[in-house]
Amino acid sequence: MQWETVIGLEIHAQLATQSKIFSGSSTAFGAAPNTQASLVDLAMPGTLPVLNEEAVRMACLFGLAIDARIDRQNVFARKNYFYPDLPKGYQTSQMDHPIVGKGHLDITLEDGTTKRIGITRAHLEEDAGKSLHEDFQGMSGIDLNRAGTPLLEIVSEPDIRSAKEAVAYVKAIHALVRYLGICDGNMAEGSLRCDCNVSVRPKGQAEFGTRAEIKNVNSFRFIEKAINHEIQRQIELIEDGGKVVQETRLYDPNKDETRSMRGKEEANDYRYFPCPDLLPVVIEPEYLAKLREQLPELPVQKRERFESQYGLSAYDASVLSASREMADYFEKVQGICGDAKLAANWVMVELGSLLNKDGLEIEQSPVSAEQLGGMILRIKDNTISGKIAKMVFEAMANGEGSADQIIEAKGLKQVTDSGAIEKMLDEVLAANAEQVEQYRAADEAKRGKMFGFFVGQAMKASKGKANPQQVNELLKKKLEA
C-alpha cells in the first residue's frame, strides 16, 4: 500500500523584547537561575500582569509579513494545567481570539519549485519556567528565569507532505522572524522550538489519520530525522495490524527514535477561559498602516530581486538571502567590486567554508565585506590571479590587513609583462625539451592533456604570479611554432 504523510507544525518563536510579556523582568539568556523572575513571574498574590506593547507590535509585524488577517480585538485566555515550572497553575495564552489569523508562507523546495503553506494562526503567550534534573541528586530544580518570556506560537495548516518540506518551512519561518527582527532564531538556546504533528493515511484517502505530536525539536536536522522516524513507526505499526494512538512523543537524537511522553491533550482538557486580569487588546487600522510602512524587504522579495537585478541562479539567490546579515554582506561586497557573480562565489564558497570550519555566523566573519570586495577588485584588474587570491583571503582571515597591504607585503602582484613571461616560458620549455617533442608529435586529443602539464610547470616557475591568460596564449604560440 502507498502511504501519504500529513504534517502540521507549531513553532514557538521567542520574541526579542528586552522585558517579559507581563512583567518588567529581563529576558536575557544565560543569567543565574531565578535571578530574572519578578513577583508577577512568581505568581505572588496581589500581583497583576501588564501587557508588553513591544510584543504586540512584533506579533502584528509577523501577521503583516504573512499576509494574515489581524483581528481588531483579540483576547488573552488562561490555559489551565499543572506543572512544577508553571507557578500560577495556568499559562496566559490566546485561544478563540488570537492576534494573528489565517495567512500563508511560500517555501522553496529542493527542485526549485515553490509551495504555499497555510498558516492557521499565530498567538501570543508566555513561556513556562525550566525544570533542571542533572544538577540535583534524586531531585529536580526549578529555574523561573524563562517564566513569562514572550512567545509567538505559529500554527501551520496540515499542508506539509514530507520531512524535507517541513524543514524548508521551518527554515522559511526562521529567516522571516530574523528579517523582521522579532526573534534571534537561536535554536540552541531555545529561541525557536518546533512541535511536529505527524500522521499517515493511504494515498488518495481524504480523511486524516491519527496524529502524534513530537514536542520541542530544536534543530533543522533533528526535525527531519524525528519526522522520518515517526512516519516509519506509524506505517510499520499500521501494517502490523496495530493502531496509532494520539499522544505526545519526544525525539531522542542519541538513539534516533521517538518515545511516548504522555497522552495527547485536547483544548477541552486545558479548560480555557478569558483571562480576567487583562483587557481585550484593540488594534486600530491606523496602527497597522504605520507598521506596514516599517516592513523590511522580506526573504522571498530579496531572493527574487537577487535573481532579476544581479542575474544570480535561483540556488545562489536562495543561499545569499537566507539571512538578512548574509544578504547585507553580499550586497556590500557586490557594491565594492561591481561583479555579482564573483562576489556570490567568494561569499558562498570561500567565506562559507571558513565560517563553517570555525563555527561562525556571517556577522562574526574575520574578513569584512570591505576587505573581500577590495580583494575581488584586485582579481578583476589582474593585480592577482584567482589562485593567489586564495592566499590573500587566508591572510586577511588571519588579520594581516587589507588585500592591497598583503599583496604589497608578500610581493604577490601578478606578472603581466609579456617579455618577462616569454623569458620564463623559454626556460620552462628548454627544461622540458623531451616533452615538447612529444607534444609536437601528438594528435589533438593528446595535446590537450599535455598542454596542462606545461601550464602547471609555468605557474610553478612563476610561483603562481604569472597571468594565467597570458601564459596560455604565449605558451600555445611557442609550442605550435
From Swiss-Prot:
Functional note: Allows the formation of correctly charged Asn-tRNA(Asn) or Gln-tRNA(Gln) through the transamidation of misacylated Asp-tRNA(Asn) or Glu-tRNA(Gln) in organisms which lack either or both of asparaginyl-tRNA or glutaminyl-tRNA synthetases. The reaction takes place in the presence of glutamine and ATP through an activated phospho-Asp-tRNA(Asn) or phospho-Glu-tRNA(Gln).
Matching HAMAP family: GatB
Reactions catalysed according to its record: L-glutamyl-tRNA(Gln) + L-glutamine + ATP + H2O = L-glutaminyl-tRNA(Gln) + L-glutamate + ADP + phosphate + H(+); L-aspartyl-tRNA(Asn) + L-glutamine + ATP + H2O = L-asparaginyl-tRNA(Asn) + L-glutamate + ADP + phosphate + 2 H(+)
SMART domains: GatB_Yqey (SM00845)
UniProt keyword Membrane, yes or no: no
One Pfam family from the record: GatB_N
EC number: 6.3.5.-
Source superkingdom: Bacteria
The keyword tRNA processing appears for this protein: no
Top EC category: ligase
This protein's UniProt keywords: ATP-binding, Ligase, Nucleotide-binding, Protein biosynthesis
GO biological process, one term: translation
Any GO MF annotation of the entry: glutaminyl-tRNA synthase (glutamine-hydrolyzing) activity
Family listed: Belongs to the GatB/GatE family. GatB subfamily.
InterPro entries: Asn/Gln-tRNA_amidoTrfase_suB/E, Asn/Gln-tRNA_Trfase_suB/E_cat, Asn/Gln_amidotransferase, Asn/Gln_tRNA_amidoTrase-B-like, GatB, GatB_C_1, GatB_Yqey_C_2, Gln-tRNA_amidoTrfase_suB_CS
Protein name (record): Aspartyl/glutamyl-tRNA(Asn/Gln) amidotransferase subunit B
Oligomer and partners: Heterotrimer of A, B and C subunits.
